[in-house]
Amino acid sequence: MFDLKNLVIASGNKGKLREIGTLLAPLKIAVVPQSDFNITEIDEPHPTFIENALIKARHASRQTGLPALADDSGICVNTLKGAPGVFSARYAGEPKSDQRNNMKLVEALKTATDRSAYYYCVAVLLRHAEDPQPIIAEGLWHGEFILEPRGDGGFGYDPHFL
């Protein structure tokens, strides 16, 4: 076992930071965004969510000396052969923009008869930067991409994922 009083979160996504902080608050774990250490987001060069989450967690843990939690996630649309997938955050290019990403996906699916999709998320927890046994959790949620946004409590593709 390891002492988990402080946990660096390898993300600059304010929505994710807020959700993780809320989830871990009852456990009395201090969630520290990597930006508090002046760590910039690392590139996500890999073709899989697991590899990208692992490289982000290792980078944050190396820079801070703290245990690290990182995720990589995205929406995968069946008609688009899994796109945007690992490119979900930058689907419409740089700089990252939820609004532009959603607009691009709406345009791509405007005439599609099948808008089935799934949201995939991988979370990696490292006890230290060289942890040989990272804790890896995966989640998958099936749904449909809708052209008109709904709701107001989410971020990313949430308004279009039903």
What residue spans do the PLM features occupy?
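Anionic-ligand binding patches
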Residues: 2-8, 14-162
